[in-house]
Amino acid sequence: MGSEVWVGTWRPHRPRGPIAALYRGPGPKYKLPTNTGYKLHDPSRPRAPAFSFGSRPPLRHATCGPGPSYLVPARMTVRGTVGSPAFSIYGRLSHTAPVLTPGPGRYYPERARNVTYPSAPRHTIAPRNWGILAKQETPGPGSYTVPSLLGSRVISKVSAPTYSIYSRSPVGSCFEDLSKTPGPCAYHVVNPMIYKTRAPQFTMLGRTLPPRENTKKPGPASYSVDKVVWSRGSRGRG
């Protein structure tokens, strides 16, 4: 007892870290899986025998021939068809247009000239193809507009700040119409005959013509008395 160092009376103090003995856990209820034995099996329990059913392996066919689903003709054998020879009669072919082959009179051997005899090489200079150049719609020098050197439109030039002066806005000013009502000129003058005593009104018709017949009748000049050759006399009285 004399060799031990006296540290004083023990007093309760706060531990520096958590002590596992002070907490209650699940205990040995859970076990870690073992590294030996069967997979997904508790080693503390007996294990019954287990069997696995494998899949059926595919059948290997020695020959790939047609099965009963194909209908083989009855006269077909290994050496060919058994039976009498058979022939097919086709229809008459349609008449095709005759080939228009040029005759001897269509050829002009006298125009061959140097083609049939050895001659020096000859070259042909083709004219300038204006058709292709005409289709190229390329803008000319006058189609390009050179940017102005004034203002802020030149990218490579330093310009002073520019300001725009806008017109006076009616919003918030004394000219703003907050009521949105029409003025005196928006109303039309009402006819006083509507709300006052209406005076008598008369209508004047046009001049009326007496009724007359509009048929065209012959006048005195339409009759030729001198051309009458026979006239019926008066009827006698009985």
From Swiss-Prot:
Pfam families documented for this protein: SHIPPO-rpt
Transmembrane region(s): none
Ranges: STPGR repeats: 182-207
Database matches in InterPro entries: CIMAP, SHIPPO-rpt
Region called Disordered, residue ranges: 206-238
A single cellular component GO annotation: motile cilium
Protein name stated in the entry: Ciliary microtubule associated protein 1B
